[in-house]
Swiss-Prot record:
Synthesizes alpha-1,4-glucan chains using ADP-glucose. The keyword Glycosyltransferase applies. GO terms for biological process: glycogen biosynthetic process. The keyword Transferase applies. Belongs to the glycosyltransferase 1 family. Bacterial/plant glycogen synthase subfamily. InterPro entries: Glyco_trans_1 (IPR001296), GS/SS (IPR011835), Starch_synth_cat_dom (IPR013534). This is Probable glycogen synthase. It comes from Methanocaldococcus jannaschii (strain ATCC 43067 / DSM 2661 / JAL-1 / JCM 10045 / NBRC 100440). PANTHER family: ALPHA AMYLASE DOMAIN-CONTAINING PROTEIN, GRANULE-BOUND STARCH SYNTHASE 1, CHLOROPLASTIC/AMYLOPLASTIC. SUPFAM superfamilies: UDP-Glycosyltransferase/glycogen phosphorylase (SSF53756). It catalyses: [(1->4)-alpha-D-glucosyl](n) + ADP-alpha-D-glucose = [(1->4)-alpha-D-glucosyl](n+1) + ADP + H(+). Pfam families: Glyco_transf_5, Glycos_transf_1. The gene is glgA.
Length: 521
């Protein structure tokens, strides 16, 4: 099968959020047995940092003006997938999400693909590709699919063939098959009026995103942190860190937590991080507040964008009360909405010693937060799929999350009543139903009760199932240690691109699009 993928952003060249990671990984794993090429734009001239061949020029007309693009051929630096990159200096420097870019991108795509033979399917991703998908189907008569990574972002209104609709609606209307990124999210949105209207009984399903387990292998954490700092910062120079497996995570993770966060190794690292050239996909990091404690003081981490979707209003309401009731610490690594950033800075400064706010975008630091945290929180109001929970679990860190979308599909929840239904040997996190203060506080307290605070009570039924009674949170047989192991193996077996059924399902989606396009009456 010859597959063309339209990619708004791609990790590590230009990446914002999880979409860039999927655009790196999906082509990599689809290319086994298929011919795959990715079409993208030269955002901020970043592709000039790669070896490339300038193969031709394409001129398109936008609002009466002729704009000429160089067409660059290169390969992805880590996956080897073929990339076709459209480059014009003026357009390159527009914001990554500027709709003008994607109006022009649509014409670039159809002009380029018009000379490419034997294309089986064109796969577009999110609103940015909606117009391109419409034109590939309508003008080039090619089978097309559209993957909705976050339906909350629909793009600007645009006119096409006398109809006015958003970029996303246009893509849904013209695509031969449509999917979103988890089965539960597909169920949540399938009856939204605009989706129902434009789907018009076409195939619609949810296919889970995955992660490349080789990228998030805790045995490679030092190598990963070095690579992600352009080999300018070696984490071993700042604090204790060691590769670890699922089997020894209960020994290594608490030492990373204590050394980097409670003893302060992270502060010197951030100071040096802010001095190096990081490229367009990373930023300097501001430090506000701080955390201290002993090795058994629970540390709860957050990694993600500072947006309303991620549940910040709930966290701002609940965390002060949680700090009053419990001896716990929080570390945040986030960047985004300025108002959220300011509220978080103020919260951290008010609770210095108990909250550390790292304001910025840094992939090495995200690995560190995953590895050093006892739990990761994701109180999202909605979550189409989510990659953070998979990345956290790959680092053997259980997740406290809202029971929604992809979080529901990827986290195996600790039973609400472990006395009667102890499932510590299977659970990878805690799910709560309502993402408000009460729900979130229940989730955090349920997690901490059964992994830190109630070890004596746990012994009553842990002995029943023939485990030695744990005395400390990180004993080999403790609930937390068991859940750490569960997390890694769950990701490896069920959520990695290598082993999950998602690649097979994408091939099925493409086959359905081809059938719909050519064979449906």
């Amino acid at each position: 099968m010859k597959i063309v993928i339209l990619a708004p952003t791609i990790t590590p060249i230009v990446s914002y959020g999880g979409l860039g990671d999927v655009m790196r990984d999906l082509p990599k794993f689809l290319k086994k047995g298929n011919e795959v090429v990715v079409l993208t734009l030269n955002h901020y001239n970043r592709y000039f940092t790669l070896p490339y061949e300038d193969i031709k020029k394409i001129t398109v007309i936008y609002k009466g003006a002729k704009i000429t693009f160089d067409v660059l051929r290169t390969k992805h630096p880590t996956t080897g997938v073929d990339l076709i990159v459209f480059s014009n200096e003026s357009v390159n420097n527009l914001n990554v999400w500027d709709p003008i870019k994607y109006e022009i991108f649509a014409d670039l795509v159809i002009t380029y693909l018009d000379e490419v033979k034997d294309i089986d399917v064109v796969s577009g991703h999110d609103w940015m590709c909606g117009l391109a998908i419409a034109k590939c189907n309508d003008i080039l008569d090619l089978p097309t699919t559209l993957t909705i990574h976050n339906e909350a972002f629909k793009g600007e209104m645009i006119e096409y063939k006398g109809e006015v609709m958003t970029f996303l609606e246009l893509g849904i209307k013209y695509a031969d098959a449509v999917n979103t990124v988890s089965p539960s999210h597909a169920e949540e949105i399938k009856n939204y009026p605009y989706i129902k209207k434009y789907l018009n009984n076409k195939p619609f399903c949810g296919i889970l995103n995955g992660i490349d387990i080789d990228e998030y292998d805790p045995m490679k954490i030092i190598e990963r942190m070095c690579n992600l700092s352009n080999n300018k910062l070696d984490p071993r120079n700042y604090a204790y860190i060691s590769p670890y497996s699922a089997e020894d995570s209960h020994n290594i993770k608490p030492k990373i937590k204590y050394s980097w966060f409670y003893r302060g190794g992270v502060y010197e690292y951030v100071e040096d991080w802010n001095k190096i050239d990081k490229g367009i996909s990373a930023t300097d990091v501001e430090v506000h507040g701080g955390v201290d404690g002993d090795i058994e003081t629970p540390l709860i981490g957050f990694v993600g964008r500072a947006t309303h979707q991620k549940g910040f209003n709930t966290m701002f309401e609940a965390i002060p009360e949680l700090l009053e009731k419990h001896d716990i610490r929080f570390v945040f690594l986030t960047k985004g909405d300025r108002d959220i950033e300011e509220r978080l800075k103020n919260l951290a400064n008010e609770h210095d010693g108990r909250i550390l706010a790292l304001i910025g975008y840094s992939l090495p630091l995200s690995s560190l937060v995953f590895a050093g945290s006892d739990w990761i929180i994701m109180p999202s109001y909605w979550e189409p799929c989510g990659l953070v929970q998979m990345e956290a679990m790959a680092y053997c860190t259980p997740v406290i999350a809202t029971e929604t979308g992809g979080l529901k599909d990827t986290i195996i929840p600790l039973h609400p009543n472990p006395y009667e239904h102890p499932n510590f040997d299977k659970a990878t996190g805690v799910l709560f139903k309502v993402p408000d203060k009460v729900g979130f506080m229940w989730g955090v307290e349920h997690a901490l009760n059964w992994t830190f605070y109630k070890l004596n009570e746990i012994c009553m039924f842990m002995q029943y199932i023939r485990y030695k009674c744990p005395k400390h949170p990180y004993d080999e047989n403790s609930p937390l240690s068991m859940m750490m192991k569960n997390c890694y193996y769950h990701v490896f077996r069920n959520l990695s691109w290598q082993n999950s059924p998602s690649i097979r399902k994408y091939k099925g989606l493409f086959g359905g699009a081809i059938y719909n396009h050519y064979l449906q009456p």
